[in-house]
Amino acid sequence: MVSVFLSSLLLSVATAQVYSPAQQIDVQSSLLSDPNKVAGKTYDYIIAGGGLTGLTVAAKLSENPKIKVLVIEKGFYESNDGAIIEDANAYGQIFGTTVDQNYLTVPLINNRTSSIKSGKGLGGSTLINGDSWTRPDKVQIDSWEKVFGMEGWNWDTMFEYMKKAELARAPTDAQIAAGHYFNATCHGFNGTIHSGPRDNGQPWSPIMKALMNTTSALGIPTQQDFLCGHPRGVSMIYNNLDENQVRADAGRAWVLPNYQRPNLKIMTGQTVGKVLFNQTASGPKAVGVNFGTNKAVNFDVYAKHEVLLAAGSAISPLILEYSGIGLKSVLDAANVTQLVDLPVGLNMQDQTTTTVSSRTNAAGTGQGQAVFFANFTEVFGDYTPQARELLNTKLDQWAEETVARGGHNNVTALKIQYENYRDWLLEEDVAYAELFMDTSGKINFDLWDLIPFTRGSVHILSSDPYLWQYANDPKFFLNELDLLGQAAASKLARELSTKGAMAQYFAGETIPGNNLAADANLSQWSDYVIQNFRPNWHAVSSCSMMAKELGGVVDATAKVYGTQGLRVVDGSIPPTQVSSHVMTIFYGMALKVADAILADYAKSA
Protein backbone atom coordinates (compact mmCIF):
# COMPACT_ATOMS: atom_id res chain seq x y z
CA MET A 1 0.00 0.00 0.00
CA VAL A 2 1.10 3.55 -0.60
CA SER A 3 2.17 5.33 2.55
CA VAL A 4 0.60 8.62 3.65
CA PHE A 5 3.96 10.32 3.06
CA LEU A 6 4.28 8.96 -0.48
CA SER A 7 0.67 9.80 -1.23
CA SER A 8 1.21 13.38 -0.13
CA LEU A 9 4.42 13.63 -2.13
CA LEU A 10 2.84 12.33 -5.30
CA LEU A 11 -0.19 14.54 -4.87
CA SER A 12 2.07 17.56 -4.70
CA VAL A 13 3.92 16.43 -7.83
CA ALA A 14 0.65 16.05 -9.73
CA THR A 15 -0.75 19.48 -8.92
CA ALA A 16 -2.23 20.95 -12.08
CA GLN A 17 -2.03 24.41 -13.48
CA VAL A 18 -5.41 26.09 -13.14
CA TYR A 19 -6.58 28.01 -16.18
CA SER A 20 -8.69 31.10 -15.62
CA PRO A 21 -11.85 31.97 -17.59
CA ALA A 22 -9.85 34.75 -19.24
CA GLN A 23 -7.31 32.23 -20.49
CA GLN A 24 -10.10 30.04 -21.82
CA ILE A 25 -11.44 33.02 -23.76
CA ASP A 26 -7.93 33.73 -25.00
CA VAL A 27 -7.74 30.18 -26.34
CA GLN A 28 -10.98 30.67 -28.23
CA SER A 29 -9.72 33.88 -29.81
CA SER A 30 -6.49 32.19 -30.90
CA LEU A 31 -8.28 29.51 -32.92
CA LEU A 32 -8.85 29.99 -36.62
CA SER A 33 -12.38 29.83 -37.96
CA ASP A 34 -11.97 31.59 -41.33
CA PRO A 35 -10.59 29.07 -43.84
CA ASN A 36 -9.31 31.87 -46.04
CA LYS A 37 -6.64 32.55 -43.42
CA VAL A 38 -4.90 29.25 -44.24
CA ALA A 39 -6.08 28.49 -47.78
CA GLY A 40 -3.19 28.36 -50.21
CA LYS A 41 -0.57 28.60 -47.47
CA THR A 42 2.16 26.07 -46.72
CA TYR A 43 2.92 24.47 -43.34
CA ASP A 44 5.51 21.88 -42.48
CA TYR A 45 2.91 19.44 -41.20
CA ILE A 46 -0.85 19.32 -41.61
CA ILE A 47 -2.79 17.21 -39.12
CA ALA A 48 -6.29 16.09 -40.09
CA GLY A 49 -8.14 15.82 -36.79
CA GLY A 50 -7.78 17.54 -33.43
CA GLY A 51 -8.50 14.59 -31.17
CA LEU A 52 -6.30 12.68 -28.76
CA THR A 53 -3.56 11.65 -31.17
CA GLY A 54 -3.72 14.68 -33.43
CA LEU A 55 -3.24 17.14 -30.59
CA THR A 56 -0.56 15.01 -28.97
CA VAL A 57 1.48 14.91 -32.17
CA ALA A 58 0.86 18.62 -32.82
CA ALA A 59 2.11 19.56 -29.37
CA LYS A 60 5.27 17.48 -29.71
CA LEU A 61 6.13 18.71 -33.22
CA SER A 62 5.52 22.35 -32.35
CA GLU A 63 7.95 22.19 -29.44
CA ASN A 64 10.46 23.00 -32.17
CA PRO A 65 9.74 26.66 -33.01
CA LYS A 66 11.02 26.12 -36.55
CA ILE A 67 8.30 23.58 -37.33
CA LYS A 68 5.01 25.08 -38.54
CA VAL A 69 2.01 22.89 -37.74
CA LEU A 70 -1.61 23.24 -38.84
CA VAL A 71 -4.38 21.20 -37.18
CA ILE A 72 -7.76 21.04 -38.93
CA GLU A 73 -10.66 19.91 -36.72
CA LYS A 74 -14.32 19.49 -37.64
CA GLY A 75 -15.53 20.49 -34.18
CA PHE A 76 -14.70 23.34 -31.85
CA TYR A 77 -13.03 24.06 -28.52
CA GLU A 78 -15.35 23.15 -25.64
CA SER A 79 -18.98 24.00 -26.49
CA ASN A 80 -22.29 24.90 -24.91
CA ASP A 81 -22.00 21.46 -23.31
CA GLY A 82 -18.79 22.36 -21.50
CA ALA A 83 -20.14 21.68 -18.02
CA ILE A 84 -21.15 18.16 -19.02
CA ILE A 85 -17.77 17.57 -20.63
CA GLU A 86 -15.94 18.61 -17.48
CA ASP A 87 -17.94 16.37 -15.13
CA ALA A 88 -16.96 12.74 -15.61
CA ASN A 89 -19.92 11.70 -13.47
CA ALA A 90 -22.16 13.03 -16.26
CA TYR A 91 -20.91 10.36 -18.68
CA GLY A 92 -23.56 9.60 -21.26
CA GLN A 93 -25.33 12.95 -21.03
CA ILE A 94 -23.04 14.31 -23.73
CA PHE A 95 -24.19 11.68 -26.23
CA GLY A 96 -26.30 13.14 -29.01
CA THR A 97 -25.03 16.68 -28.54
CA THR A 98 -22.92 18.75 -30.93
CA VAL A 99 -19.79 17.16 -29.44
CA ASP A 100 -20.86 13.66 -30.51
CA GLN A 101 -20.20 12.62 -34.13
CA ASN A 102 -22.85 9.90 -33.72
CA TYR A 103 -21.92 7.85 -36.78
CA LEU A 104 -24.45 5.22 -37.83
CA THR A 105 -23.64 1.67 -38.85
CA VAL A 106 -25.32 -0.34 -41.55
CA PRO A 107 -28.12 -2.62 -40.25
CA LEU A 108 -26.55 -5.25 -38.00
CA ILE A 109 -27.37 -8.80 -36.95
CA ASN A 110 -30.54 -7.60 -35.19
CA ASN A 111 -31.65 -5.67 -38.30
CA ARG A 112 -31.07 -2.36 -36.54
CA THR A 113 -28.48 0.33 -37.13
CA SER A 114 -26.30 1.32 -34.18
CA SER A 115 -24.76 4.61 -33.20
CA ILE A 116 -20.97 4.87 -33.02
CA LYS A 117 -20.09 7.49 -30.41
CA SER A 118 -17.04 9.57 -31.27
CA GLY A 119 -16.01 12.98 -30.01
CA LYS A 120 -16.17 16.07 -32.22
CA GLY A 121 -14.05 18.97 -31.00
CA LEU A 122 -10.56 19.70 -29.79
CA GLY A 123 -9.93 16.63 -27.68
CA GLY A 124 -11.92 14.19 -29.80
CA SER A 125 -13.35 11.26 -27.90
CA THR A 126 -11.58 12.32 -24.69
CA LEU A 127 -14.42 14.86 -24.48
CA ILE A 128 -17.13 12.21 -24.22
CA ASN A 129 -15.63 8.93 -23.03
CA GLY A 130 -15.68 7.38 -19.56
CA ASP A 131 -12.16 8.62 -18.67
CA SER A 132 -10.98 5.12 -17.73
CA TRP A 133 -7.20 4.72 -17.49
CA THR A 134 -5.78 1.19 -17.78
CA ARG A 135 -3.03 -0.47 -19.83
CA PRO A 136 -3.02 -3.65 -21.95
CA ASP A 137 -1.28 -6.92 -21.29
CA LYS A 138 2.43 -7.07 -22.09
CA VAL A 139 2.04 -10.01 -24.45
CA GLN A 140 -0.48 -8.09 -26.53
CA ILE A 141 1.89 -5.22 -27.26
CA ASP A 142 4.84 -7.58 -27.72
CA SER A 143 2.86 -9.33 -30.45
CA TRP A 144 2.87 -6.14 -32.52
CA GLU A 145 6.59 -6.70 -33.01
CA LYS A 146 6.81 -10.50 -32.87
CA VAL A 147 3.73 -11.43 -34.89
CA PHE A 148 3.10 -8.40 -37.10
CA GLY A 149 6.67 -7.37 -37.83
CA MET A 150 6.53 -3.87 -36.37
CA GLU A 151 10.05 -3.32 -35.09
CA GLY A 152 10.19 -1.29 -31.89
CA TRP A 153 6.53 -1.85 -31.01
CA ASN A 154 6.96 -3.92 -27.86
CA TRP A 155 5.86 -3.60 -24.25
CA ASP A 156 9.11 -2.24 -22.87
CA THR A 157 9.23 0.59 -25.40
CA MET A 158 5.53 1.43 -25.27
CA PHE A 159 5.46 1.28 -21.46
CA GLU A 160 7.97 4.13 -21.33
CA TYR A 161 5.99 6.20 -23.83
CA MET A 162 2.74 5.59 -21.96
CA LYS A 163 4.35 6.66 -18.69
CA LYS A 164 5.85 9.69 -20.44
CA ALA A 165 2.33 10.93 -21.20
CA GLU A 166 1.05 10.50 -17.64
CA LEU A 167 0.81 12.89 -14.70
CA ALA A 168 -0.28 10.47 -11.98
CA ARG A 169 -1.97 11.21 -8.67
CA ALA A 170 -1.78 8.48 -6.04
CA PRO A 171 -4.88 7.42 -4.07
CA THR A 172 -5.45 8.61 -0.54
CA ASP A 173 -5.67 6.17 2.35
CA ALA A 174 -9.47 6.38 2.20
CA GLN A 175 -9.44 5.58 -1.51
CA ILE A 176 -7.13 2.62 -0.90
CA ALA A 177 -9.46 1.38 1.82
CA ALA A 178 -12.35 1.58 -0.65
CA GLY A 179 -10.53 -0.67 -3.13
CA HIS A 180 -7.83 1.26 -5.00
CA TYR A 181 -4.26 0.04 -5.33
CA PHE A 182 -1.22 1.96 -6.57
CA ASN A 183 2.15 0.73 -7.77
CA ALA A 184 4.26 3.85 -8.33
CA THR A 185 6.67 2.02 -10.65
CA CYS A 186 3.85 1.59 -13.17
CA HIS A 187 3.04 5.29 -13.45
CA GLY A 188 4.51 8.47 -14.87
CA PHE A 189 4.71 11.72 -12.93
CA ASN A 190 6.12 14.23 -15.39
CA GLY A 191 3.61 14.03 -18.23
CA THR A 192 0.64 16.10 -19.30
CA ILE A 193 -2.30 13.71 -18.94
CA HIS A 194 -3.75 13.63 -15.43
CA SER A 195 -4.69 10.28 -13.94
CA GLY A 196 -6.07 9.53 -10.51
CA PRO A 197 -9.03 8.14 -8.57
CA ARG A 198 -12.53 9.32 -9.33
CA ASP A 199 -14.02 10.68 -6.10
CA ASN A 200 -17.14 12.84 -5.87
CA GLY A 201 -16.75 13.33 -2.13
CA GLN A 202 -19.60 11.01 -1.16
CA PRO A 203 -19.13 7.97 1.10
CA TRP A 204 -17.73 4.90 -0.61
CA SER A 205 -20.01 1.98 -1.35
CA PRO A 206 -19.00 -1.32 0.29
CA ILE A 207 -19.93 -3.12 -2.93
CA MET A 208 -16.47 -2.74 -4.50
CA LYS A 209 -14.90 -4.66 -1.63
CA ALA A 210 -17.80 -7.12 -1.69
CA LEU A 211 -17.05 -7.92 -5.33
CA MET A 212 -13.37 -8.34 -4.49
CA ASN A 213 -14.18 -10.65 -1.58
CA THR A 214 -16.54 -12.68 -3.75
CA THR A 215 -14.02 -13.17 -6.56
CA SER A 216 -11.08 -13.64 -4.19
CA ALA A 217 -12.89 -16.63 -2.70
CA LEU A 218 -12.78 -18.11 -6.22
CA GLY A 219 -9.01 -17.65 -6.46
CA ILE A 220 -9.20 -14.51 -8.60
CA PRO A 221 -6.64 -11.74 -7.89
CA THR A 222 -7.98 -8.53 -6.37
CA GLN A 223 -6.92 -4.96 -5.65
CA GLN A 224 -4.40 -4.74 -8.48
CA ASP A 225 -2.87 -1.81 -10.37
CA PHE A 226 -4.15 -2.29 -13.91
CA LEU A 227 -1.38 -0.16 -15.41
CA CYS A 228 1.48 -2.62 -14.86
CA GLY A 229 1.13 -4.86 -17.90
CA HIS A 230 -1.12 -7.72 -16.80
CA PRO A 231 -4.66 -6.49 -16.09
CA ARG A 232 -6.37 -9.39 -14.36
CA GLY A 233 -8.84 -9.75 -11.52
CA VAL A 234 -10.85 -7.10 -9.70
CA SER A 235 -9.84 -3.63 -8.60
CA MET A 236 -10.89 -0.02 -8.76
CA ILE A 237 -9.38 1.90 -11.67
CA TYR A 238 -7.95 5.32 -12.38
CA ASN A 239 -9.48 8.05 -14.51
CA ASN A 240 -8.35 11.04 -16.54
CA LEU A 241 -9.31 13.60 -13.92
CA ASP A 242 -7.30 16.37 -12.33
CA GLU A 243 -7.21 16.88 -8.58
CA ASN A 244 -10.38 18.97 -8.82
CA GLN A 245 -12.18 16.03 -10.49
CA VAL A 246 -12.36 17.88 -13.83
CA ARG A 247 -12.04 15.84 -17.01
CA ALA A 248 -8.44 16.03 -18.23
CA ASP A 249 -9.25 15.79 -21.94
CA ALA A 250 -6.68 16.12 -24.71
CA GLY A 251 -7.79 19.67 -25.47
CA ARG A 252 -7.00 20.82 -21.96
CA ALA A 253 -3.80 18.79 -21.92
CA TRP A 254 -2.31 19.98 -25.20
CA VAL A 255 -4.13 23.13 -26.42
CA LEU A 256 -4.27 25.16 -23.22
CA PRO A 257 -0.53 25.04 -22.49
CA ASN A 258 0.53 25.52 -26.11
CA TYR A 259 -2.00 27.67 -27.96
CA GLN A 260 0.26 30.75 -27.83
CA ARG A 261 2.99 29.07 -29.86
CA PRO A 262 3.27 31.14 -33.06
CA ASN A 263 4.14 28.02 -35.06
CA LEU A 264 0.98 26.11 -34.04
CA LYS A 265 -2.25 26.99 -35.83
CA ILE A 266 -5.58 25.29 -35.19
CA MET A 267 -8.48 25.58 -37.61
CA THR A 268 -11.90 24.56 -36.24
CA GLY A 269 -15.24 23.96 -37.89
CA GLN A 270 -13.70 22.45 -41.04
CA THR A 271 -13.45 18.89 -42.36
CA VAL A 272 -10.49 17.40 -44.21
CA GLY A 273 -11.92 15.71 -47.28
CA LYS A 274 -8.93 14.25 -49.03
CA VAL A 275 -5.17 14.32 -49.40
CA LEU A 276 -3.54 16.14 -52.32
CA PHE A 277 -0.75 14.29 -54.14
CA ASN A 278 1.98 14.93 -56.65
CA GLN A 279 3.03 11.95 -58.70
CA THR A 280 6.73 11.08 -58.43
CA ALA A 281 8.93 8.25 -59.61
CA SER A 282 8.67 6.77 -56.11
CA GLY A 283 4.89 6.96 -56.02
CA PRO A 284 2.36 9.55 -54.88
CA LYS A 285 3.74 12.22 -52.55
CA ALA A 286 1.31 13.97 -50.20
CA VAL A 287 1.61 17.73 -50.65
CA GLY A 288 -1.47 19.00 -48.81
CA VAL A 289 -5.16 18.50 -48.15
CA ASN A 290 -8.49 19.69 -49.41
CA PHE A 291 -10.76 20.83 -46.57
CA GLY A 292 -14.08 22.59 -46.20
CA THR A 293 -17.74 22.05 -45.43
CA ASN A 294 -19.26 20.97 -48.75
CA LYS A 295 -18.49 20.36 -52.41
CA ALA A 296 -19.00 24.03 -53.27
CA VAL A 297 -17.04 25.49 -50.35
CA ASN A 298 -13.65 23.89 -49.90
CA PHE A 299 -10.02 24.93 -49.94
CA ASP A 300 -6.51 23.61 -50.48
CA VAL A 301 -3.64 24.01 -48.02
CA TYR A 302 -0.16 22.62 -48.47
CA ALA A 303 2.36 20.60 -46.47
CA LYS A 304 6.11 20.97 -47.00
CA HIS A 305 6.94 17.75 -45.16
CA GLU A 306 3.96 15.53 -44.34
CA VAL A 307 0.22 15.10 -44.01
CA LEU A 308 -0.80 13.26 -40.83
CA LEU A 309 -4.26 11.67 -40.60
CA ALA A 310 -5.71 11.67 -37.09
CA ALA A 311 -9.44 11.58 -37.79
CA GLY A 312 -10.08 8.30 -35.98
CA SER A 313 -10.73 4.68 -36.89
CA ALA A 314 -14.05 5.47 -38.58
CA ILE A 315 -12.89 8.43 -40.69
CA SER A 316 -9.18 8.16 -41.51
CA PRO A 317 -9.85 5.13 -43.77
CA LEU A 318 -12.46 7.18 -45.63
CA ILE A 319 -10.03 10.07 -46.18
CA LEU A 320 -7.54 7.60 -47.65
CA GLU A 321 -10.19 6.15 -49.95
CA TYR A 322 -11.42 9.58 -51.09
CA SER A 323 -7.77 10.29 -51.89
CA GLY A 324 -7.39 7.21 -54.09
CA ILE A 325 -5.78 4.84 -51.59
CA GLY A 326 -7.68 1.61 -51.03
CA LEU A 327 -9.15 -1.47 -52.64
CA LYS A 328 -9.88 -1.12 -56.35
CA SER A 329 -13.34 -2.63 -55.98
CA VAL A 330 -14.31 -0.01 -53.38
CA LEU A 331 -12.80 2.92 -55.28
CA ASP A 332 -14.29 1.88 -58.62
CA ALA A 333 -17.75 1.64 -57.07
CA ALA A 334 -17.32 5.17 -55.66
CA ASN A 335 -15.88 6.54 -58.93
CA VAL A 336 -12.50 7.37 -57.38
CA THR A 337 -9.29 6.82 -59.34
CA GLN A 338 -7.00 4.41 -57.53
CA LEU A 339 -3.47 5.63 -56.76
CA VAL A 340 -2.33 2.92 -54.33
CA ASP A 341 -3.82 -0.54 -53.76
CA LEU A 342 -4.08 -1.21 -50.00
CA PRO A 343 -6.68 -2.99 -47.81
CA VAL A 344 -7.91 0.27 -46.31
CA GLY A 345 -11.00 -0.02 -44.12
CA LEU A 346 -10.69 -3.78 -43.58
CA ASN A 347 -9.79 -5.66 -40.38
CA MET A 348 -11.85 -3.24 -38.25
CA GLN A 349 -12.24 -4.65 -34.75
CA ASP A 350 -14.74 -3.27 -32.26
CA GLN A 351 -16.19 -4.77 -29.12
CA THR A 352 -19.81 -5.16 -27.99
CA THR A 353 -21.44 -4.13 -24.72
CA THR A 354 -24.38 -5.43 -22.72
CA THR A 355 -25.68 -4.38 -19.32
CA VAL A 356 -26.75 -6.31 -16.23
CA SER A 357 -28.15 -4.04 -13.55
CA SER A 358 -29.69 -4.51 -10.11
CA ARG A 359 -31.01 -2.42 -7.27
CA THR A 360 -29.11 -2.31 -4.01
CA ASN A 361 -30.40 -1.93 -0.49
CA ALA A 362 -29.55 0.96 1.82
CA ALA A 363 -26.45 -0.81 3.12
CA GLY A 364 -24.94 -0.80 -0.37
CA THR A 365 -25.32 2.88 -1.18
CA GLY A 366 -22.33 5.05 -1.95
CA GLN A 367 -20.02 5.95 -4.80
CA GLY A 368 -17.47 3.82 -6.60
CA GLN A 369 -16.54 1.77 -9.63
CA ALA A 370 -14.68 -1.51 -9.88
CA VAL A 371 -13.53 -3.54 -12.87
CA PHE A 372 -13.20 -7.30 -13.29
CA PHE A 373 -10.75 -8.29 -16.02
CA ALA A 374 -11.78 -11.94 -16.44
CA ASN A 375 -9.84 -14.60 -18.32
CA PHE A 376 -11.26 -17.12 -20.77
CA THR A 377 -12.01 -19.79 -18.17
CA GLU A 378 -13.56 -17.35 -15.70
CA VAL A 379 -15.91 -16.05 -18.39
CA PHE A 380 -17.03 -19.39 -19.81
CA GLY A 381 -17.06 -21.44 -16.59
CA ASP A 382 -18.67 -24.81 -17.28
CA TYR A 383 -18.78 -23.98 -21.00
CA THR A 384 -14.98 -23.63 -21.23
CA PRO A 385 -14.35 -27.02 -22.92
CA GLN A 386 -16.76 -26.18 -25.74
CA ALA A 387 -15.31 -22.69 -26.17
CA ARG A 388 -11.76 -24.03 -26.12
CA GLU A 389 -12.71 -26.57 -28.78
CA LEU A 390 -13.89 -23.77 -31.06
CA LEU A 391 -10.52 -22.04 -30.77
CA ASN A 392 -8.67 -25.27 -31.50
CA THR A 393 -10.72 -26.36 -34.51
CA LYS A 394 -12.44 -23.40 -36.20
CA LEU A 395 -9.72 -20.85 -37.06
CA ASP A 396 -9.41 -21.89 -40.71
CA GLN A 397 -13.16 -21.81 -41.19
CA TRP A 398 -13.50 -18.45 -39.46
CA ALA A 399 -10.77 -16.90 -41.59
CA GLU A 400 -12.39 -18.13 -44.80
CA GLU A 401 -15.84 -16.90 -43.73
CA THR A 402 -14.49 -13.50 -42.68
CA VAL A 403 -12.76 -12.94 -46.02
CA ALA A 404 -15.90 -14.03 -47.87
CA ARG A 405 -17.91 -11.45 -45.89
CA GLY A 406 -15.48 -8.62 -46.67
CA GLY A 407 -13.89 -8.18 -43.25
CA HIS A 408 -10.42 -9.05 -44.53
CA ASN A 409 -8.87 -9.93 -47.88
CA ASN A 410 -6.27 -12.60 -47.02
CA VAL A 411 -7.18 -15.91 -45.38
CA THR A 412 -3.60 -16.86 -44.53
CA ALA A 413 -2.82 -13.48 -42.97
CA LEU A 414 -6.05 -13.44 -40.98
CA LYS A 415 -5.39 -16.90 -39.60
CA ILE A 416 -2.12 -15.56 -38.16
CA GLN A 417 -4.16 -12.95 -36.29
CA TYR A 418 -6.56 -15.60 -35.03
CA GLU A 419 -3.72 -17.86 -33.86
CA ASN A 420 -2.26 -14.91 -31.97
CA TYR A 421 -5.57 -14.31 -30.19
CA ARG A 422 -6.02 -18.01 -29.47
CA ASP A 423 -2.59 -18.17 -27.86
CA TRP A 424 -3.36 -15.12 -25.71
CA LEU A 425 -6.55 -16.70 -24.41
CA LEU A 426 -5.45 -20.29 -23.92
CA GLU A 427 -1.78 -19.93 -22.99
CA GLU A 428 -1.09 -16.41 -21.70
CA ASP A 429 -3.91 -15.75 -19.19
CA VAL A 430 -4.86 -12.57 -21.03
CA ALA A 431 -8.13 -10.95 -19.94
CA TYR A 432 -10.95 -11.97 -22.29
CA ALA A 433 -13.78 -9.82 -20.94
CA GLU A 434 -14.17 -6.67 -18.88
CA LEU A 435 -17.01 -6.37 -16.38
CA PHE A 436 -17.23 -2.71 -15.38
CA MET A 437 -19.27 -2.27 -12.18
CA ASP A 438 -20.75 1.09 -11.15
CA THR A 439 -22.50 1.62 -7.82
CA SER A 440 -24.32 4.80 -6.68
CA GLY A 441 -27.49 3.07 -5.50
CA LYS A 442 -27.20 0.14 -7.88
CA ILE A 443 -25.08 -2.79 -8.94
CA ASN A 444 -24.60 -1.98 -12.61
CA PHE A 445 -22.36 -4.07 -14.85
CA ASP A 446 -21.49 -2.83 -18.34
CA LEU A 447 -19.48 -5.63 -19.88
CA TRP A 448 -17.76 -6.54 -23.11
CA ASP A 449 -15.77 -9.24 -24.85
CA LEU A 450 -12.31 -7.67 -25.20
CA ILE A 451 -10.87 -9.94 -27.90
CA PRO A 452 -13.25 -10.15 -30.88
CA PHE A 453 -12.66 -12.52 -33.78
CA THR A 454 -15.19 -10.66 -35.94
CA ARG A 455 -13.67 -8.34 -38.54
CA GLY A 456 -15.69 -5.44 -39.89
CA SER A 457 -15.12 -2.77 -42.51
CA VAL A 458 -15.68 0.90 -43.26
CA HIS A 459 -15.76 2.21 -46.84
CA ILE A 460 -16.84 5.22 -48.90
CA LEU A 461 -19.92 5.02 -51.12
CA SER A 462 -19.34 8.12 -53.27
CA SER A 463 -16.52 10.35 -54.47
CA ASP A 464 -17.70 13.44 -52.54
CA PRO A 465 -16.04 13.56 -49.09
CA TYR A 466 -18.47 16.20 -47.87
CA LEU A 467 -21.63 14.15 -48.44
CA TRP A 468 -20.67 11.64 -45.71
CA GLN A 469 -21.86 8.67 -47.72
CA TYR A 470 -20.13 5.61 -46.29
CA ALA A 471 -20.81 2.12 -44.96
CA ASN A 472 -19.62 1.42 -41.41
CA ASP A 473 -20.17 -2.30 -40.96
CA PRO A 474 -18.68 -3.79 -37.76
CA LYS A 475 -20.29 -7.17 -38.56
CA PHE A 476 -20.88 -7.81 -34.86
CA PHE A 477 -21.45 -11.44 -33.81
CA LEU A 478 -20.87 -12.94 -37.24
CA ASN A 479 -18.25 -14.96 -35.40
CA GLU A 480 -19.83 -17.57 -33.12
CA LEU A 481 -17.25 -17.27 -30.33
CA ASP A 482 -17.83 -13.52 -30.03
CA LEU A 483 -21.53 -14.07 -29.41
CA LEU A 484 -20.95 -16.90 -26.94
CA GLY A 485 -18.33 -14.83 -25.12
CA GLN A 486 -20.62 -11.83 -24.77
CA ALA A 487 -23.41 -14.11 -23.58
CA ALA A 488 -21.15 -15.87 -21.07
CA ALA A 489 -19.81 -12.59 -19.67
CA SER A 490 -23.37 -11.32 -19.26
CA LYS A 491 -24.37 -14.53 -17.51
CA LEU A 492 -21.33 -14.18 -15.23
CA ALA A 493 -22.33 -10.62 -14.28
CA ARG A 494 -25.77 -11.81 -13.22
CA GLU A 495 -24.24 -14.60 -11.13
CA LEU A 496 -21.78 -12.26 -9.42
CA SER A 497 -24.55 -9.81 -8.47
CA THR A 498 -26.01 -12.33 -6.01
CA LYS A 499 -22.95 -14.41 -5.13
CA GLY A 500 -20.99 -14.51 -1.87
CA ALA A 501 -20.50 -11.14 -0.19
CA MET A 502 -22.51 -9.43 -2.96
CA ALA A 503 -25.75 -11.10 -1.87
CA GLN A 504 -26.15 -8.90 1.22
CA TYR A 505 -26.52 -5.78 -0.98
CA PHE A 506 -28.69 -7.20 -3.77
CA ALA A 507 -32.28 -5.91 -3.92
CA GLY A 508 -33.58 -7.22 -7.24
CA GLU A 509 -32.44 -7.26 -10.85
CA THR A 510 -33.76 -4.63 -13.27
CA ILE A 511 -31.80 -5.54 -16.44
CA PRO A 512 -32.46 -8.08 -17.93
CA GLY A 513 -34.92 -8.65 -15.08
CA ASN A 514 -38.04 -10.48 -16.16
CA ASN A 515 -36.93 -10.36 -19.80
CA LEU A 516 -34.69 -13.37 -19.24
CA ALA A 517 -35.32 -16.42 -17.07
CA ALA A 518 -33.27 -16.63 -13.89
CA ASP A 519 -31.86 -20.00 -14.99
CA ALA A 520 -31.26 -18.96 -18.63
CA ASN A 521 -28.65 -21.05 -20.42
CA LEU A 522 -25.95 -19.75 -22.76
CA SER A 523 -28.15 -20.16 -25.83
CA GLN A 524 -30.91 -18.05 -24.24
CA TRP A 525 -28.37 -15.45 -23.17
CA SER A 526 -27.08 -15.35 -26.76
CA ASP A 527 -30.57 -14.59 -28.06
CA TYR A 528 -30.92 -11.85 -25.46
CA VAL A 529 -27.54 -10.33 -26.31
CA ILE A 530 -28.34 -10.08 -30.03
CA GLN A 531 -31.39 -7.96 -29.27
CA ASN A 532 -29.87 -5.83 -26.51
CA PHE A 533 -26.20 -5.11 -27.25
CA ARG A 534 -24.56 -1.88 -28.33
CA PRO A 535 -21.13 -1.15 -29.82
CA ASN A 536 -18.39 -0.48 -27.29
CA TRP A 537 -16.90 2.35 -29.40
CA HIS A 538 -13.32 1.05 -29.19
CA ALA A 539 -12.77 0.24 -32.89
CA VAL A 540 -9.19 -0.25 -34.06
CA SER A 541 -7.22 -1.65 -37.03
CA SER A 542 -9.09 -0.11 -39.98
CA CYS A 543 -5.69 1.19 -41.20
CA SER A 544 -3.67 -1.63 -39.69
CA MET A 545 -0.03 -1.16 -38.72
CA MET A 546 1.55 -4.44 -39.73
CA ALA A 547 3.70 -5.97 -42.43
CA LYS A 548 2.20 -5.25 -45.84
CA GLU A 549 1.91 -8.95 -46.69
CA LEU A 550 -0.22 -9.46 -43.56
CA GLY A 551 -2.71 -6.78 -44.59
CA GLY A 552 -0.91 -3.68 -43.40
CA VAL A 553 -1.83 -0.16 -44.47
CA VAL A 554 0.95 1.61 -42.55
CA ASP A 555 4.46 0.58 -41.52
CA ALA A 556 6.18 0.75 -38.13
CA THR A 557 6.58 4.53 -38.44
CA ALA A 558 2.90 4.93 -39.39
CA LYS A 559 3.76 5.77 -43.02
CA VAL A 560 1.18 4.68 -45.57
CA TYR A 561 2.67 1.99 -47.78
CA GLY A 562 3.34 3.08 -51.36
CA THR A 563 3.25 6.82 -50.61
CA GLN A 564 5.56 9.56 -49.46
CA GLY A 565 4.80 12.22 -46.88
CA LEU A 566 1.66 10.56 -45.53
CA ARG A 567 1.06 8.88 -42.18
CA VAL A 568 -1.93 7.72 -40.17
CA VAL A 569 -1.38 8.46 -36.48
CA ASP A 570 -4.66 7.54 -34.75
CA GLY A 571 -6.59 4.63 -33.29
CA SER A 572 -7.10 3.06 -36.69
CA ILE A 573 -3.52 1.71 -36.75
CA PRO A 574 -3.12 -0.68 -33.75
CA PRO A 575 -3.02 -4.16 -35.32
CA THR A 576 -4.89 -5.84 -32.46
CA GLN A 577 -7.52 -5.24 -29.86
CA VAL A 578 -6.24 -5.02 -26.30
CA SER A 579 -7.43 -5.99 -22.83
CA SER A 580 -7.68 -2.38 -21.74
CA HIS A 581 -9.34 0.95 -22.23
CA VAL A 582 -7.54 2.47 -25.17
CA MET A 583 -6.44 5.98 -24.14
CA THR A 584 -3.13 4.96 -22.59
CA ILE A 585 -2.19 3.11 -25.77
CA PHE A 586 -3.20 6.00 -28.02
CA TYR A 587 -1.23 8.58 -26.01
CA GLY A 588 1.87 6.40 -25.94
CA MET A 589 1.47 5.54 -29.61
CA ALA A 590 1.16 9.22 -30.59
CA LEU A 591 4.30 10.15 -28.68
CA LYS A 592 6.23 7.30 -30.30
CA VAL A 593 5.08 8.25 -33.80
CA ALA A 594 5.89 11.91 -33.10
CA ASP A 595 9.45 10.89 -32.33
CA ALA A 596 9.62 9.05 -35.66
CA ILE A 597 8.34 12.14 -37.47
CA LEU A 598 10.88 14.36 -35.73
CA ALA A 599 13.68 11.94 -36.58
CA ASP A 600 12.77 12.18 -40.28
CA TYR A 601 12.51 15.96 -40.00
CA ALA A 602 16.01 16.13 -38.53
CA LYS A 603 17.35 14.15 -41.50
CA SER A 604 15.74 16.55 -43.96
CA ALA A 605 16.74 19.76 -42.20
UniProtKB/Swiss-Prot annotation:
Q: Which domain of life is it from?
A: Eukaryota
Drop me one GO molecular function for this one: beta-D-glucose oxidase activity
Listed binding positions for O2 are K559, V560
Q: Does the keyword tRNA-binding apply?
A: no
Under catalytic activity, the entry for this protein gives: beta-D-glucose + O2 = D-glucono-1,5-lactone + H2O2
Where FAD is bound, by residue?
L52, T53, E73, S125, N129, G130, S132, V272, G571, M583
Q: Which cofactors does this protein require?
A: FAD
Cited Pfam families = GMC_oxred_C, GMC_oxred_N
Active site, per annotation: H538 (proton acceptor)
Compartments it resides in: Secreted; Secreted, Cell wall; Cytoplasm; Secreted, Extracellular space, Extracellular matrix
Subunit structure, briefly?
Answer: Homodimer.
Membership in a protein family = Belongs to the GMC oxidoreductase family.
Q: What is this protein called?
A: Glucose oxidase
Q: What's the name of its gene?
A: gox
